[in-house]
């Protein structure tokens, strides 16, 4: 929509962790310019006061209250809002901007009947569900080209779907009885203070949560094509997701070598996927838009094991959103996105 060489973008809900990560990545993006950042709870505050790490790029930027008129003519808007908060504003934004990318859950599930079951409320604009493409480029890239609406995947579904999808699409595993155990850093719980995410609660602790009820379960099933038993865990770290997926091969002769070769071939042209024999670590993906994968077949028990690691705030949220925006807006997919993690 813009004739400016740099695409003009905005963020609704920029004061949370995913919003701050969007700001960091856009600040280093050579073809995007952030022109408005809303954060109703921080309206009137300088970005640098809440996130000193963003001072060099946003020295004078102030969070504003949401006003739809501020987004007139923008090339894209990213929504970093809580569950159910994007639905009331999307129709209006579609009239104003080139592409709406929702980092929340409001448009990920295609069946509106799933929302009251998993999110406790009816979907208020079910007619718009089909306007949103599911934003996992490695699986749905062609659908993202020129998309007006993008439902950016959740962090757990990103890690699980990228691990399982190659085997499902190749017809190599049973699609029932799949197990996904995944651990996330505490940033996945958001910036708001909660008793179970304080330093004292998280440090030197490791626990499962959302037993049988986690909202990412139907999303993982929708994207991977598997029936899954999903158990998330909270790990004593800030960033990262490590997902361990278990499935039964359909062919008893399927081997570790076969599994690794399948992953390598499936993702051979993917700039953000690393397949290796080495067991992935979350630290290796810190700050990067990459996913590290490996696989093993246990001949003794007959189980296929697939492990994936990613940064929940980058590939699992804001980096994935930028990747989708690049595709939807006709830019090179990798523009502005880091592929190397921070070590040590």
PLM feature spans:
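N-terminal Rossmann-like NAD(P) cofactor-binding subdomain of oxidoreductases
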Residues: 2-202, 207-209, 296-299, 334, ...
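Short glycine-rich or small-residue beta-strand-to-loop segments that form or flank ligand, phosphate
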Residues: 8-11, 151, 244-246, 306-309
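Conserved active-site and cofactor/substrate-binding residues in soluble primary-metabolism enzymes
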Residues: 17, 131, 155-162, 211-218, ...
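Alpha-helical scaffold segments in soluble metabolic enzymes
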Residues: 21, 25, 162-166, 219-223, ...
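Short, solvent-exposed beta-strand edge segments and adjacent coil->beta transition regions
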Residues: 147, 206, 240-244, 303-305
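C-terminal substrate-binding/catalytic lobe of Rossmann-fold NAD(P)-dependent dehydrogenases
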Residues: 198, 212-279
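C-terminal active-site/capping subdomain that shapes the small-molecule cofactor and substrate pocket
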Residues: 246-344
């Amino acid at each position: 929509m813009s004739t400016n060489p740099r695409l003009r973008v905005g963020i609704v809900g920029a004061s949370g962790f995913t919003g701050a990560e969007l700001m960091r990545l856009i600040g280093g993006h050579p073809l995007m310019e952030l022109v408005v950042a809303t954060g109703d709870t921080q309206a009137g505050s300088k970005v640098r006061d809440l996130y000193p790490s963003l001072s060099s790029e946003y020295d004078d930027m102030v969070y504003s209250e949401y006003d739809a008129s501020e987004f007139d003519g923008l090339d894209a808007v990213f929504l970093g809002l809580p569950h159910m908060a994007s639905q009331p504003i999307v129709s209006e934004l579609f009239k104003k901007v080139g592409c709406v990318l929702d980092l929340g859950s409001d448009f990920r599930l295609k069946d509106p009947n799933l929302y009251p079951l998993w999110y406790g409320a009816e979907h208020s604009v079910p007619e718009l569900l089909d306007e949103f493409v599911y934003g996992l480029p490695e699986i749905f890239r062609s659908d993202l080209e020129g998309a007006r609406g993008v439902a950016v995947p959740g962090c757990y579904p990103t890690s699980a779907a990228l691990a399982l999808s190659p085997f499902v699409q190749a017809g190599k595993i049973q699609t029932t009885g799949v197990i996904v155990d995944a651990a996330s850093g505490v940033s996945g719980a958001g910036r708001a203070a909660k008793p179970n995410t304080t330093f004292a609660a998280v440090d030197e602790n490791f626990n499962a949560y959302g037993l049988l009820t986690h909202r990412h379960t139907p999303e993982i099933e929708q994207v991977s094509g598997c029936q899954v038993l999903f158990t998330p865990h909270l790990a004593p770290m800030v960033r990262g997701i490590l997902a361990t997926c278990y499935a039964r091969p359909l062919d008893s002769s399927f081997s570790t070598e076969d599994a690794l070769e399948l992953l390598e071939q499936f993702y051979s042209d993917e700039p953000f996927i690393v397949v290796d024999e080495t067991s992935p670590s979350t630290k290796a993906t810190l700050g990067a838009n990459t996913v590290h994968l490996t696989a093993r077949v246990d001949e003794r028990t007959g189980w296929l094991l697939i492990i994936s690691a990613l940064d929940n705030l980058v590939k699992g949220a804001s980096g994935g959103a930028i990747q989708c925006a690049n595709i939807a807006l006709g830019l090179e997919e990798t523009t502005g996105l880091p592929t190397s993690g921070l070590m040590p």
